[in-house]
């Protein structure tokens, strides 16, 4: 009995040290050495100060900015502590009302825009924290942003194209734009 108890205790302590201390320290150390920016949260800086992460969406509401995907985190948009989807099905009246309200807000912000509204501008993601939108979503907003900033639409479209990321491995996902990085670049431009 003592032998079994002792062996169990040694195994428990060994595995606790290995999986609870040694492995996390090893992975953290490797991350800091091999991927220092990512291990620090993929932060974006302005004037030497961190202003956000390229991995978490930020709320933008002014006409001069490209707007990201709607956030399902309530009551505060893009709240990482409340990450999660709305879990509303496609026929749920609450979801339909939310989408209709988002469409109305986009139309009101840019009444002359006759382009079809990309779906990612009116639907929240599963996490509610998406930092990126489709190229179509960014291009849809180019005219509004250009007018608000006193830039030409061609300039805004060129910046969108500069920030475009392709599909992963050439075939996974859709081409996309990081909203925070693009808005930081727009802030650096003067009309």
Swiss-Prot record:
Which cellular components does GO assign to this protein? plasma membrane
Going by the entry's taxonomy, the superkingdom of the source organism is recorded as Bacteria
Leader sequence segment: none
| Alphabetized InterPro entries for the sequence | KdpC
Q: How does it sit in the membrane?
A: Single-pass membrane protein
What are the transmembrane regions? 7-27
Q: Name one GO molecular function term.
A: P-type potassium transmembrane transporter activity
Q: Which UniProt keywords apply?
A: ATP-binding, Cell inner membrane, Cell membrane, Ion transport, Membrane, Nucleotide-binding, Potassium, Potassium transport, Transmembrane, Transmembrane helix, Transport
Principal place of residence: membrane
Q: Where in the cell is it found?
A: Cell inner membrane
Recorded hits in Pfam families, A to Z, give: KdpC (PF02669)
Subunit structure comment from the entry: The system is composed of three essential subunits: KdpA, KdpB and KdpC.
**Hey, which family's this protein in?**
Belongs to the KdpC family.
Report the function annotation for this chain: Part of the high-affinity ATP-driven potassium transport (or Kdp) system, which catalyzes the hydrolysis of ATP coupled with the electrogenic transport of potassium into the cytoplasm. This subunit acts as a catalytic chaperone that increases the ATP-binding affinity of the ATP-hydrolyzing subunit KdpB by the formation of a transient KdpB/KdpC/ATP ternary complex.
Q: What is this protein called?
A: Potassium-transporting ATPase KdpC subunit
